């Protein structure tokens, strides 16, 4: 197993984690978002090729928990609504809405 260092916005831990885990009571959504965000950072782009099975294996969650988490993340505007790619190899768009607010 290789270890990569990742640099994530403080907003993810200071605001998003308490919001998703505490307020929304969706810790799986935070875990899935953290995985997708880390993968996006590693790839250097906002689109991450990741099937339900891949996300489940990488996070330790069940596929059904990943599905529920992705639905919640889409509703919250943290993952793009439209999946690109194929059903077997979907590409998920990772959104960072707080960056738009900070830039405004």
What are the functions of these language-model segments?
Residues 1-57, 87:
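Short recognition helix of helix-turn-helix/winged-helix DNA-binding domains
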Residues 62-104:
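Winged-helix/helix-turn-helix nucleic-acid-interaction surface
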């Amino acid at each position: 197993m290789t270890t990569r260092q990742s640099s994530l916005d403080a907003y993810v831990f200071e605001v998003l984690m308490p919001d998703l885990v505490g307020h929304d009571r969706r810790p799986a959504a935070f875990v899935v978002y953290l995985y997708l965000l880390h993968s996006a950072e590693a790839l250097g782009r906002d689109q991450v090729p990741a099937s339900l099975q891949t996300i489940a294996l990488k996070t330790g969650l069940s596929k059904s928990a990943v599905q529920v988490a992705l639905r919640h993340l889409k509703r919250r505007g943290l993952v793009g609504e439209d999946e690109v790619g194929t059903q077997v190899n979907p590409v998920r768009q990772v959104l960072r809405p707080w960056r738009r607010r900070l830039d405004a």
